[in-house]
Amino acid sequence: MSRRLSLLTLVPALVAFSLAQAQGLPRSARPADARVYFITPAKGQVVHGKVLVRFGLSGMGVSPAGVTGPGTEGTGHHHLFVDAPPPAADQVLPKDEHHLHFGKGQTETTLDLPKGKHTLQLVFGDANHVPHDPPLLSDRIEITVK
């Protein structure tokens, strides 16, 4: 019983410690001319059914999450915010149904969104899912699914 109680106490403490440490991660610099953008869909586009989203990037390279070391400077991976506000610049990017991570280096996805208006924004994160310094964000676009 005491071992189980110890685990119940220890696990949340370790999670809290890990999250606190993650929030203090250093931010990676990015080139001033780098930009992230949507290839598709276009701002204001009306789509029927599933939405093909293609990510564009210039001035930097794409690499999988967790990959660091020589040759990975100026790289990162995409995150897609769906119906979510812009991220805090100094925190690990969240991961849930509104914050999609593409940590394998993917540059496109297909979304199955409900009918209605939706906002999309790309955020380029470093190997640790932290925005670069300064953050590299796309324009926030609105689309309509019919």
Question: What are these language model-derived features?
Answer:
Residues T9-A16:
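Bacterial N-terminal signal peptides
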Residues G24-H48:
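Short, compositionally biased P/S/T/A/G/V-rich stretches that sit at domain boundaries
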Residues V51-F55, T107-T109, G116-F124:
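Short, well-structured beta-strand segments within conserved domains
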Residues G56-G71:
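Short amphipathic, basic-aromatic surface patches that mediate peripheral association
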Residues V67-H78, L137:
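Short coil-to-beta strand junction motifs in C2/discoidin
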